[in-house]
Amino acid sequence: MNKKANPGLKIICLNRKASFNFFFEDLIEAGIVLKGSEIKSIRDGKVNIADSYAVEKDGEIVLINSHIAAFKQASYSNHNPTDERKLLLNKKEINKLIGKMQRDGFTLVPTKMYFKKGKAKIEIAVAKGKKQFDKRATKKNRDWNREKARHIRKSS
């Protein structure tokens, strides 16, 4: 009985750097406006969201600096790999995010991209940047947890 945790979800890309560099306050799922060649590249797994972030532009949330590789089989109508991509959110969600960004100094960082029921989705974290000492503490805790797990395995 090998069942997946979430059968309708196929994760394409993770942003592991985000959890190291930021404190997450809230996670929001958003759709992405894509062209045909972009969706085919995403299905091939040729996506990088490690250095990307989202900003407000003309009352919309836009994903910047995400890299979706050009699709080889697309001829003249291929897309630009580093285009800005509009995120699909409700007006209420957009206003909430804009308020947090302006008032509280939060930033919007993508944490993962996945397919849900055949549609490409992206998980955006409302996050605040970590200082250098916070990053050191995170690394220290991670190393300590690894060491504890090793000791437990040895003693068993």
UniProtKB/Swiss-Prot annotation:
Compositionally biased spans, kind Basic and acidic residues: 133-147
Keyword annotations of the record: Cytoplasm, RNA-binding
Similarity field: Belongs to the SmpB family.
NCBIfam families: PRK05422.1 (NF003843), smpB (TIGR00086)
Identification of the protein by name: SsrA-binding protein
Organism: Pelagibacter ubique (strain HTCC1062)
Subcellular location field: Cytoplasm
Domain of life: Bacteria
Gene name in the database record: smpB
Gene Ontology MF terms: RNA binding
